[in-house]
Amino acid sequence: MPEQFSVAEFLAVTAEDLSSPAGAAAFAAKMPRYRGAALAREEILEGDQAILQRIKKAVRAIHSSGLGHVENEEQYREAVESLGNSHLSQNSHELSTGFLNLAVFTREVAALFKNLIQNLNNIVSFPLDSLMKGQLRDGRQDSKKQLEKAWKDYEAKMAKLEKERDRARVTGGIPGEVAQDMQRERRIFQLHMCEYLLKAGESQMKQGPDFLQSLIKFFHAQHNFFQDGWKAAQSLFPFIEKLAASVHALHQAQEDELQKLTQLRDSLRGTLQLESREEHLSRKNSGCGYSIHQHQGNKQFGTEKVGFLYKKSDGIRRVWQKRKCGVKYGCLTISHSTINRPPVKLTLLTCQVRPNPEEKKCFDLVTHNRTYHFQAEDEHECEAWVSVLQNSKDEALSSAFLGEPSAGPGSWGSAGHDGEPHDLTKLLIAEVKSRPGNSQCCDCGAADPTWLSTNLGVLTCIQCSGVHRELGVRFSRMQSLTLDLLGPSELLLALNMGNTSFNEVMEAQLPSHGGPKPSAESDMGTRRDYIMAKYVEHRFARRCTPEPQRLWTAICNRDLLSVLEAFANGQDFGQPLPGPDAQAPEELVLHLAVKVANQASLPLVDFIIQNGGHLDAKAADGNTALHYAALYNQPDCLKLLLKGRALVGTVNEAGETALDIARKKHHKECEELLEQAQAGTFAFPLHVDYSWVISTEPGSDSEEDEEEKRCLLKLPAQAHWASGRLDISNKTYETVASLGAATPQGESEDCPPPLPVKNSSRTLVQGCARHASGDRSEVSSLSSEAPETPESLGSPASSSSLMSPLEPGDPSQAPPNSEEGLREPPGTSRPSLTSGTTPSEMYLPVRFSSESTRSYRRGARSPEDGPSARQPLPRRNVPVGITEGDGSRTGSLPASSVQLLQD
């Protein structure tokens, strides 16, 4: 830092320069020092300005919290005063006097504190506001610029004169005096230096003595606050001493009364033998029978909870054992002491929850064959568990009643809205199991693994899952596909990872033979050593130098495996990534993933969130990933962040929360989600808007198996498969299509789709995991328009719409061949409709009964299948209703043109 100088020194040297020519040389020699000192002073002033900005922010926070404290004290005073009035109405004068006097004292102290907070705002906050205004700083900056300009002019003139002097020496001339020739430039520098020192001195005075004087005034206000509070306490102190003595005497008197009442109760019990009768009733009620009046739970505790309870064992010793328990979807799971044993799963619909009236921390759960005795940590925790159990039971009971199938026509299934997540979860779990490598354990190769690491997306066996649980949730979060109740969002990563893809990265350096990888018969010690090396040390992972630029590219390209490779090589997801060029600003990993996210990159965002994505890390502008999700309208990323417990109330540099940004940008869905999270009503499990791609395997044994795979997912009531004039009912092998007027149906009734034609294409199930608010994808329905011309019926789009539920026109969907499509033999006449005749009156519906229709296989046939088994069924000269893939046009074909699929 350049050497500092005093204003007095500058005044003395400048005065000497003005008074005598000899002082010009002295001032010229000190000009560089003066310039450097001015720059240093400006830097100090800027630093003080930043500190004052922090003080201003803290003072504002103290002022707002102080006002809140005053409001809470006022509510406390009102409650104490109400209690005193209550005792006064009961003629308890000593107690009422104590409560009322303490309420008055609280009011005085609250008034003093409120005055102190207002003084803080007036004495400290207002001067800070004037200091933070940019007028002083702008004037100082202008003076500094003028000073810099004068210095540059002086240097330029000095260089020019030096050249002239050198030229005069060469030519033999007489060089002039530099000090005299530079007098004007020197005077200009002195002028601007004076102006800058004036501005800087004014700023220093306001930031130093003036602000300190304000703090001294606030100190006096604090001194008065404590003095007045001490005086108020001293005036009440004699009364408090007398009150304490009288309250002690009153307590002793009431205790004597209670003791006498206890003795009287015991004597009455002995006389009337009430103890034996109560024991008899207790034994009777503690059996397997159910009480008529069920305990009602507190709805504030919700329907889901995970934690630890003490369960009384059934052995001879009957000791309390600590067990992990969880309530979800109307079921209670109780873990064992050994992690390899699957937990006990109890359906709450067949259970009854009974609080223990004597032990407030205990409650009983009565099932059909035994009674479980539980104990919580305290009474409040016990109340929470009892309420959650009862609420979950009530919710399951309501879902069961609402999901009953109606007796009227057109009803389909019993799930409705309640069954959609469960059906989708079953379908997604089957898809996860069919991923490459998921038929074997990711670590030991055991067959049929059923334990999922939700943050890594891999399947393991029950033995390896025990070691994963020992690692902790930081490395692996294990859930059971069969015992735990998973939501679609928890299967998001597993659907896009798989054991094979994961091990291609995490076991790339593993020797193919003789390596440390365990087998299905290995002991727990071998498994533990290998899993620690694989998941904690990343010893066998594919090696590469962590490059932030490569991770940036992987996130922008939605490359999940490249992100996994960076994670395996120790890339810190909390460090900012440089942009693709030097001009682009740096981005945090999670911020960038949320910013560029789309529907296909949700698994990548979920992976970063669950594996060290630093949910609450702030960017340079103070925005967290939650702010980015609200700013760029990413509601699905917002759901994943809220599932990861991101903080909702964090503010950025502008003082805005994520909810404020969503409101300002008019992103309604993000705003609703953040409001639910802020109010504590955010619903689990999550339903993200993701294209769930579910494959139908070509190895089905029968049409029933294939139909079960295709129709497992039930559609909501809003999506009707039957249009206004087309009535379709669907059974396993029976399709009835009537083009006449259908029976009117309510909006809540669902009609199933016609039986889809069997092929090995992939079925796209989209939008089934949306939020329960009704934001669901449209489902193509059969139109109610009149039949189209024969040309429209023979179009490829019409044929493909019968072959697959995918949208027509997709390049990946080739038209069916002559054996698979619908075709009409030459010479087949199509009857025309006369006026006033509907298709339902002219043609009978086509019925494919299960008795007359054989099951066909799409896989390879056995050699025993003879030609006789391949004879097609006889055709009937009746039409079959068809529709375009988008539901815009309908038509009919005679049954003679319909051929069953042949291999």
Curated annotation (Swiss-Prot):
Residues 740-903 are annotated as: Disordered. Promotes cell proliferation. CDD domains: ArfGap_ASAP3, BAR_ASAP3, PH_ASAP. This is Arf-GAP with SH3 domain, ANK repeat and PH domain-containing protein 3. GO terms for molecular function: GTPase activator activity; zinc ion binding. It comes from Homo sapiens. Residues 302-394 form the PH domain. Highly expressed in primary hepatocarcinoma. Detected in lung, liver and blood leukocytes.
